[in-house]
Amino acid sequence: ASFTFRYEIAPNSPDKPPLLNILERVNASSGSVSGQYAPGKLQLSFYQLNEDDSVKTSPFTRVYIDSEETLFDIGQLYTVLRQAVTDKLSLASVLLPEWSLGDYISQTQAAAVLGVETNKVELQELSGFTLSLKGLKKVSPSAARDGYRYYQFPAAADGTTLVLGFSTDALFSKTTPIHVLLTIPEHNVHIQLTGTVTSAKTVLSPPASRMSDEDIATLAQIRQSVESVWKMIQSAAQTTN
């Protein structure tokens, strides 16, 4: 299946998870996500929104998920972050080199760079949900939309809950309007998505461009450089105000 959604991510408490902090840094706690689903696998592309609420043409990152691992396109995310920083401070291009490492990092590598436990960045539980009505429980969530029929999947091992709302007007169409309510306790977030799912035979494979473990120290240094330049920009903005 393929899909396109508008999404909104909200923390369930004041303690924001690491991945949400990164999304907020690129103004992407709400945006658009498109992707493909095959049994046990997900490929996602995340897009920021323009000021007029239209979707940007290029994704700010991509994520590949299967039962074994979660892979993040850190190369694309860095490129977007670097552009945002250099737009505000052109001299930052000297401190922040263009990306030259492998594009994707694993959840283990991401956790090492962020200094958090692996379960704070992995998303493998999402690959275990099957797009089938078998075994689903009909529910009536408080955020239900008129004209939608809602079903809840059995909770995942980590407590992740997924509720799908199908438009009753197009329940058996090839392209179906969907309303998704997703709660991930490990990441302390609630995610709401609205869009469409199109049935299609999909074959997904892990991305080929991977970062080696030897380059993680370099990535950690790059992250520190980004943080330092960002703080410099924020300090300058506060002084100006």
Where are these regions (language model features)?
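Subset-of-secretome marker
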Residues: 1-241
